[in-house]
């Protein structure tokens, strides 16, 4: 067979198949980008607080992280096309509920839970369906197209979501997703299923429950740490032994994950299919690749939670203006991810990833300089662009590292672990860095009020009491309304507003500092990434679907 024949599409409807898969990829990527630039509008529409929307965003990523591997196993058992179809139907139901959501609870059920479950079925099946419908060069080209569509979704998402949110309503984005999913379902009949090798795997429901519960407790404890406190209790529902429940909840999650690993080994000893073959995690390159995927998305999604708070709440920009100012991250990340594979051949993935981490640290240092009461728009855009370069360098390497570290039979499982690491990073980024911002806001505000001679002792005491029940990230008009409602003298009210504004910037900078610190610590995780020698030997050409740009949100 000639190269041309080997690269030919599996059937005459290949273009329609590729369009179908590309549409699904775009829908999966679009969601979180829209939510990130709509935070302040969601707070206003549902009359809630930033921390509540933070929880909704975190839950979305957590559901996907907890169910991604199980979703892949269900695809292996049902058939990838059937899992893809069922996932899309569940996703469309979630989008429809989100579009008409009347409360935060409905939003969480529709977006975080139903869309998260649907995505956990769609995403593992999507990559397998490419392999089932394309061969040779056509398959590599299809993966490249999907990578490009995902990158375009990251770039377009903040602009599209911001414009629709500002000029119409964010609900239309999710209504539009329902229409897109219906179109995908119609086109799906032209697609052939991915072939299944061997007998369908046995489902490990106990393992799924243990892993999902463990991850949930760890993320929940991290998310609530800003409210409950890490050690000393602040606004905690319970106080075990007089301490905050945060570490107890996280430790409980760790215990469940330990039980999960024991259960997986037990199933393997019995000759039954485990949810995850733990021996794969002994592969150094795979382990490092997964750790770096986790770190990359923790940093990126944490910063993507911070930036809208600064732009919308501190600066007063609307969602569209916020999307425009965050656009350089997406553009430079996408562009650099296209160029990154070329660098790997010269320097090796390890060095390219380390350079990316250095660039991220530099961008965090730059953010510390530009997060001021009066924004320097040019400087802010430059720093955002630099951040995208660092992220793009990392993203360009890790997909190929993970896929090249296992054989053909292990690529499906490696892909599931990769998506789990990405979504867990997204959940932890929003939870951890968001908790540091909220906790830092309370701590800094109290310190500044106590040090301000214009604030009376009685008011200082009252502020301390109020902070025990939590603090909200308020815009200037909201803060002014709260001060007016308290009936304070004008001079004292002005002093409180000034202290609160300073505390907001201190809290945001604390979150940026944590992101930079995580980038520095992540150098440890690069140790087992392949260097140039290995890249030349066996990873120089990306395996199908492993190279090229990989969206950070998928």
Predicted regions, residues:
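Transmembrane-helix exit segments and adjacent C-terminal regions of multi-pass membrane proteins
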Residues: 1-21, 262-266, 400, 442-443, ...
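Flexible interhelical linker loops that connect adjacent transmembrane helices
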Residues: 8, 185-215, 228-242, 266-284, ...
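Structural signature of transmembrane alpha-helices in multi-pass secondary transporters
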Residues: 28, 57-60, 64, 91, ...
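C-terminal membrane-cytosol helix-exit motif in multi-pass small-molecule transporters
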Residues: 178-196, 214-227, 252-268, 522-530
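Transmembrane core module of solute transporters
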Residues: 14-64, 68, 169, 241-248, ...
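Interfacial helix-cap and linker-helix signal at transmembrane-aqueous boundaries
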Residues: 42-43, 74-75, 160-168, 222, ...
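C-terminal module of multi-pass small-molecule transporters
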Residues: 79-88, 97, 102-109, 122-128, ...
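Helix-loop-helix hairpins in multi-pass membrane proteins, especially solute transporters
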Residues: 74-215, 224, 241, 247
């Amino acid at each position: 067979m000639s190269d041309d024949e080997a690269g030919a599409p599996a059937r005459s409807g290949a273009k329609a198949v590729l369009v179908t898969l590309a549409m699904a990829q775009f829908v999966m990527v679009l969601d979180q980008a829209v939510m990130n630039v709509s935070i302040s509008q969601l707070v206003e529409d549902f009359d809630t607080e930033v921390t509540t929307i933070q929880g909704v965003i975190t839950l979305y990523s957590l559901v996907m992280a907890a169910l991604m591997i199980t979703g892949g196993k269900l695809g292996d058992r049902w058939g990838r096309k059937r899992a893809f179809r069922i996932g899309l139907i569940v996703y469309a139901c979630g989008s429809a509920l989100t579009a008409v959501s009347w409360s935060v609870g409905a939003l969480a059920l529709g977006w975080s839970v139903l869309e998260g479950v649907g995505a956990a079925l769609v995403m593992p099946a999507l990559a397998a369906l490419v392999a089932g419908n394309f061969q040779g060069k056509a398959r590599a080209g299809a993966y490249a197209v999907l990578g490009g569509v995902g990158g375009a979704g990251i770039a377009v998402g903040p602009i599209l979501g911001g414009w629709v949110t500002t000029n119409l309503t964010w609900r239309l984005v999710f209504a539009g997703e329902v229409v897109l999913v219906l179109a995908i379902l119609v086109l799906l009949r032209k697609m052939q299923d991915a072939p299944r090798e061997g007998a369908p795997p046995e489902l490990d429901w106990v393992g799924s429950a243990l892993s999902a519960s463990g991850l949930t407790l760890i993320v929940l404890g991290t998310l609530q740490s800003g409210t409950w406190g890490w050690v000393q209790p602040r606004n905690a529902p319970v106080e075990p032994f007089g301490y905050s429940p945060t570490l107890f909840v996280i430790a409980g999650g760790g215990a469940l994950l330990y039980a999960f690993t024991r259960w997986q080994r037990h199933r393997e000893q019995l000759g039954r299919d485990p949810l995850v073959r733990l021996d794969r995690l002994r592969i150094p390159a795979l382990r490092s690749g997964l750790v770096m995927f986790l770190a990359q998305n923790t940093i990126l999604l944490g910063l993507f939670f911070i930036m809208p708070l600064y732009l919308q709440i501190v600066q007063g920009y609307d969602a569209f203006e916020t999307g425009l100012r965050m656009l350089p991250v997406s553009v430079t990340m996408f562009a650099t991810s296209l160029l990154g594979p070329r660098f790997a051949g010269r320097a090796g993935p390890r060095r390219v990833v380390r350079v990316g981490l250095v660039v991220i640290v530099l961008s965090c240092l730059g953010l510390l300089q530009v997060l001021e009461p009066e924004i320097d728009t040019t400087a802010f855009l430059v720093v955002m662009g630099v951040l995208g370069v660092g992220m793009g360098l990392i993203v360009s390497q890790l997909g190929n590292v993970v896929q090249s570290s296992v054989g053909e039979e292990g690529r499906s499982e490696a892909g599931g672990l990769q998506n789990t690491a990405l979504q867990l990073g997204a959940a932890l980024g929003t939870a951890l860095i968001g908790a540091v911002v909220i906790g830092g806001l309370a701590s800094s505000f109290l310190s500044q009020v106590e040090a301000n001679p214009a604030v009376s002792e009685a008011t200082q005491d009252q502020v301390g009491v109020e902070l025990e029940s939590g603090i909200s990230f308020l815009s200037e008009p909201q803060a002014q309304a709260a001060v007016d409602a308290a009936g304070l003298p004008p001079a004292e009210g002005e002093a409180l507003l000034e202290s609160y504004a300073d505390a907001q910037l201190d809290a945001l900078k604390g979150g940026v500092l944590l992101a930079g610190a995580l980038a520095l610590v992540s150098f440890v995780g690069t140790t087992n990434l392949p260097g140039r020698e290995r890249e030349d030997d066996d990873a120089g050409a990306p395996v199908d679907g492993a190279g090229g740009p990989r969206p950070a949100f998928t």
